[in-house]
């Protein structure tokens, strides 16, 4: 009797695993992220710490590994050393014997013009020879600067089922926020009918006047189709060599098979039933996304055993809380406190502390994000602040109560969040000479 082969559909795990193994992920991690102000003075945005122990890029890398996409290139450019060091320390567990790898792709002026990466499309174009060496069937292009959990196997399966040339992950957002992204329109089959990068007046979704459909900067390309389009774009003098500004609008206008994938169909374990995706590109957004993690049931579940967020694990002792006097009690309430922290007769409320933070007696920290290796002296009172790593907060410093006074020394956002860095305190830990 002849055995019939298994039917390969997008519900078949074998079908999806074959797709993920035949996919190369390329993470664009070379951006500065200027809206994060001083947090990116000495590191690229994907290397900015997040969530108590992670870096922003860990979420995209974890999505790749958890989805079964384990051939990964990371494209770097702006002040990449912190990012490179983190990936080398925390992401060396992939096994090359099974064709698993993370390959760092720094800007090397690989074109005949001898230029650095000029745009997102150019960053991929300059690595075409490396992509061809790995010979993937599909290329998954990702940003390294957003916080979300996504099963990339689902967008890959949908891409193949629709016989698409390009599939773009999309999300509904309030129309007033859409001008910071690529804005799309689709037909009933979710084929993309228009695409505008960061329009001044975003078009709302038909029937939903308060919302717009935006690109998440997540693209699935058929590999050979991608190579052809990048070569064509490179030869266009008028192009800025960017996917959102040039390549995608041109593909939509030429009637290529460009489809949209709804993020809610691949978002992993939504706590509130609403897909979680955060662009932490401003100090306000960064502060809020971190503080949200201290709530009882945050929208982003970091305790999900089925979809762990991988990172470099420092060898640190547990957090310690000392002194229990009425006026000097070491305690943290509604907060996240990481390894190596010592709360010595101080009070922490609704705050997130990264590793190795030391807070001395009679100090109070409220609604704040404290990055690693910060020391806070006695009688300090910090409220609604982000403190950069390595800061030495002096005795008696009070921040967060008088914005006009705070602005004389620190950066204060429109929403009243204060950013404190060592340089602002006169502690020059970053220097060239």
Swiss-Prot record:
What is one process in the GO biological process aspect for this record? glycogen biosynthetic process
Recorded metabolic or biological pathway in which this protein acts:
Glycan biosynthesis; glycogen biosynthesis
Q: Which UniProt keywords apply?
A: ATP-binding, Carbohydrate metabolism, Glycogen biosynthesis, Glycogen metabolism, Nucleotide-binding, Nucleotidyltransferase, Transferase
- Under which EC number(s) is this enzyme classified? 2.7.7.27
Q: Does the keyword Membrane apply?
A: no
Which InterPro entries does the record match to this protein?
Answer: ADP-Glc_PPase, ADP_Glu_pyroP_CS, GlgC_bac, GlmU/GlgC-like_hexapep, NTP_transferase_dom, Nucleotide-diphossugar_trans, Trimer_LpxA-like_sf
List ligand-binding residues for alpha-D-glucose 1-phosphate: 117, 182, 197-198, 215
Short name of one Pfam family: Hexapep_GlmU
Q: Which reaction does it catalyse?
A: alpha-D-glucose 1-phosphate + ATP + H(+) = ADP-alpha-D-glucose + diphosphate
What's an example of a GO molecular-function annotation for this chain? ATP binding
Question: Is Lyase among the key words of this record?
Answer: no
Gene3D superfamilies recorded for this chain?
Answer: Hexapeptide repeat proteins, Spore Coat Polysaccharide Biosynthesis Protein SpsA, Chain A
Family label: Belongs to the bacterial/plant glucose-1-phosphate adenylyltransferase family.
Q: How does the record describe its quaternary structure?
A: Homotetramer.
Q: What's this protein's function?
A: Involved in the biosynthesis of ADP-glucose, a building block required for the elongation reactions to produce glycogen. Catalyzes the reaction between ATP and alpha-D-glucose 1-phosphate (G1P) to produce pyrophosphate and ADP-Glc.
This one is known as Glucose-1-phosphate adenylyltransferase
Native species: Nitrosomonas europaea (strain ATCC 19718 / CIP 103999 / KCTC 2705 / NBRC 14298)
| Name of the gene | glgC
């Amino acid at each position: 009797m002849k055995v019939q082969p298994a039917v390969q559909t997008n519900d078949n795990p074998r079908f999806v695993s074959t797709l993920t193994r035949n996919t190369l992920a390329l993470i664009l991690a070379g951006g500065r992220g200027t809206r994060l102000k001083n947090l990116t003075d000495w590191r690229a945005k994907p290397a900015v710490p997040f969530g108590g122990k992670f870096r922003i890029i860990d979420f995209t890398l974890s999505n790749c590994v958890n989805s079964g996409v384990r051939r990964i290139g990371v494209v770097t450019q702006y002040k990449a050393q912190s990012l490179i060091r983190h990936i080398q320390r925390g992401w060396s567990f992939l096994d090359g014997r099974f064709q698993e790898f993370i390959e760092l792709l720094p800007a090397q002026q690989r074109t005949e013009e001898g230029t650095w990466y000029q745009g997102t499309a150019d960053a991929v174009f300059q690595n075409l020879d490396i992509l061809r060496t790995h010979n993937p069937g599909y290329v998954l292009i990702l940003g390294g600067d957003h916080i979300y959990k996504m099963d990339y196997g689902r967008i890959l399966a949908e891409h193949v089922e629709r016989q698409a040339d390009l599939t773009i992950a999309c999300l509904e957002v309030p129309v007033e926020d859409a001008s910071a992204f690529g804005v799309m329109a689709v037909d009933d089959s979710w084929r993309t009918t228009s695409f505008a990068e960061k329009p001044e007046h975003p078009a709302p979704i038909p029937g939903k006047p308060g919302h717009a459909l935006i690109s998440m900067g997540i693209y699935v390309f058929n590999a050979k189709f991608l190579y052809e389009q990048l070569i064509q774009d490179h030869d266009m003098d008028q192009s800025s060599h960017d996917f959102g500004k040039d390549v995608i609008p041109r593909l939509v206008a030429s009637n290529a098979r460009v489809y949209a994938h709804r993020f809610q169909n691949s978002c992993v374990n939504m706590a509130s039933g609403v897909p979680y995706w955060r662009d932490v590109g401003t100090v306000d957004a960064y502060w809020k996304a971190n503080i949200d993690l201290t709530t009882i049931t945050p929208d982003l579940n970091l305790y999900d055993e089925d979809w762990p967020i991988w990172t470099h694990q420092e060898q640190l002792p547990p957090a310690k809380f000392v002194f229990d006097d009425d006026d000097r009690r070491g305690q943290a309430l509604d907060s996240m406190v990481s390894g190596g922290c010592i709360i010595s007769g101080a009070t922490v409320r609704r705050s997130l502390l990264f590793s190795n933070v030391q807070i001395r007696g009679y100090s109070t920290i409220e609604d704040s994000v404290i990055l690693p290796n910060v020391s806070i002296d006695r009688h300090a009172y910090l409220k609604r602040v982000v403190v950069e790593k390595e800061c030495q907060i002096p005795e008696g410093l009070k921040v967060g109560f008088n914005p006009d006074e705070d602005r004389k020394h620190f950066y204060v956002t429109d929403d009243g969040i204060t950013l404190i860095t060592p340089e602002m305190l006169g502690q020059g830990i970053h220097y060239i000479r």
